[in-house]
C-alpha cells in the first residue's frame, strides 16, 4: 500500500479566512547580548602603542601568504595602556553584574590583550574563547568595505533544527548569525561563550583592531597574587 502525505491547510480550493492575531504574553530568556560604545578618545594613544607592538613582530616574522595576519604579544601589562584597560575592565565587570552574576568575592582580570592586523584576504573562522567571561574588540584601522564582525548563535540545538529564513537580510528570531560593520574607536564586548568570526578583508589596506579577553579571579587569589610578571591584571 502506498502511503500518502497529507498537507494540512494547503487546499487552495477552499477560501482562506484570516483570523485576527492572538494577543499572547511573550517571554524572552537566555538571550545573547552584544555591547558597543564609541570611545574615540582612546584612538590616538592606543593606536600608537598598538603599532609599536605589531612592528616588533614584523621585525622577526614575515607575513604568511596563506594566513596574512600579524598578531602582537600581550599588551595589557604595558603601563601606557592603564587608562584603556581600566575602562574596559570596568565595562566587563558592569556587564556581568547587570546580567545577574554575583561578583561580591570576585574580581575581573585580563588574560589576553593583543593587536591583530589583517591584510588582504585574511579573516577568522567561527570560534570562542574558553576559560574567560568577557571578550571584546577595539577597532583601530578600518578601511573602506572592511571585514564584518559576525556573531553566531551559541545554541547548537536551535541551529540544528532551524527552519529556512524568510529574509536573511533582517535580524529575526530565525537568524543564526548577525553581522556588525566596525568603525574606528568602537568598543564591542560580548560574553566569551558567544562565538564570533570575521569575514575576509577585501582591501589592500590592513584591517587592525585590539582583541581582549577577561576572566574572573577570587579576591583571595588577588591578595596572594604574585608581583610583576603575573599573567593576569586585575582591573
Feature map (PLM): residue ranges:
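Residues at beta-strand starts and edge strands
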Residues: 31-33, 111, 132-134, 206-208
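Pocket-edge structural micro-motifs
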Residues: 38-39, 117-119, 153, 192
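Catalytic core of non-heme Fe(II) oxygenases with the double-stranded beta-helix
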Residues: 119-187, 220-225
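Solvent-exposed residues in well-ordered beta-strands and their adjoining turns
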Residues: 38-40, 139-141, 213-217
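Catalytic core of Fe(II)/2-oxoglutarate
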Residues: 170-235
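Conserved double-stranded beta-helix
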Residues: 86-146
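Short N-terminal helix-initiation segments at or just after the protein's N-terminus
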Residues: 56-60, 73-85, 130-135, 150-160, ...
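Non-heme Fe(II)/2-oxoglutarate
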Residues: 2-102, 227-233
Amino acid at each position: 500500500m502506498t502511503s500518502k502525505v497529507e498537507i494540512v491547510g494547503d487546499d487552495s480550493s477552499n477560501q482562506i479566512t484570516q483570523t485576527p492575531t492572538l494577543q499572547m504574553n511573550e517571554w524572552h530568556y537566555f538571550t545573547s547580548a552584544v555591547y558597543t560604545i564609541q570611545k574615540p578618545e582612546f584612538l590616538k594613544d592606543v593606536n600608537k602603542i598598538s603599532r609599536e607592538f605589531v612592528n616588533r613582530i614584523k621585525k622577526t616574522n614575515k607575513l604568511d601568504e596563506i594566513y596574512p595576519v600579524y598578531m602582537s604579544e600581550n599588551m595589557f601589562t604595558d603601563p601606557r595602556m592603564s587608562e584603556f584597560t581600566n575602562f574596559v575592565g570596568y565595562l566587563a565587570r558592569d556587564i556581568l553584574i547587570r546580567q545577574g552574576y554575583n561578583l561580591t568575592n570576585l574580581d575581573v582580570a585580563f588574560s589576553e590583550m593583543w593587536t591583530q592586523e589583517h591584510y588582504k584576504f585574511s579573516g577568522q573562522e567561527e570560534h570562542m574563547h574558553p576559560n574567560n567571561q568577557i571578550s571584546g574588540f577595539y577597532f583601530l584601522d578600518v578601511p573602506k568595505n572592511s571585514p564584518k564582525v559576525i556573531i553566531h548563535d551559541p545554541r547548537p540545538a536551535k541551529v540544528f533544527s532551524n527552519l529556512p529564513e524568510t529574509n536573511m537580510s533582517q535580524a529575526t528570531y530565525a537568524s543564526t548569525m548577525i553581522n556588525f560593520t566596525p568603525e574606528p574607536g568602537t568598543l564591542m564586548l560580548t560574553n566569551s561563550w558567544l562565538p564570533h568570526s570575521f569575514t575576509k578583508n577585501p582591501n589592500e589596506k590592513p584591517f587592525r583592531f585590539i582583541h581582549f579577553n577577561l576572566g574572573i579571579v577570587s579576591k583571595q587569589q588577588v591578595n596572594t597574587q604574585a608581583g610583576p610578571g603575573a599573567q593576569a591584571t586585575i582591573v
